[in-house]
Amino acid sequence: MHPEILSLSLFMFVTSCSPGPNNIVASHSGFNHGIKKTIPLMLGVIFGFTTMIAIVNFGLINLFKLYPIIQKTLIFTGTVFLIYLAYKISFSKISTQERSLNPVTFIETFMYQFLNPKGVIVAIISVSTYVEAGNNFLNYSLWVIGVAFVFAIISIIFWVLIGKFMSKFATNDKFIKLFNYAMSLLLLSCITTFYL
């Protein structure tokens, strides 16, 4: 596995740190609620994504191969949820005085990982590419899960900090509204990549 660590790390860096549903929602939460109130969301993404990769690794990938409709259903359900989330973000009533819209909880974010089309696709690709059956199966599996865990931490912290940094410019309601619209549009743009 050692020669593939660099390739796996690069793959996880690009897929984890590029804009996607988790990162956009994390940035939005960092912007509107700050770092401390976003910690449950961050932990939900980190542990949910890692758990999902482990579950795909230890059997779900075979279920997807036998019954592709399950994967398609997950992607469709995740798409519907993203549209709902984009709507909620876009039309949230937030002002510089009072930031309503409660932060996303640990459980909500943890459970969303199993509906997150980008995350499911990343899990399937990483497991099918970097985990081999045989004597080293467990070793390869632990490497993939460990690298995914590390990059989930790096990515989510980075995006929350971007949101927090942007909040310094939120001196009026118009800026906040524009930021929320931008986050909504980015979230909706993620959907197109699920069907390419």
Task: Please state what every model-predicted region is.
Residues 91-104:
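Flexible cytoplasmic inter-helical loops of multi-pass small-molecule transporters
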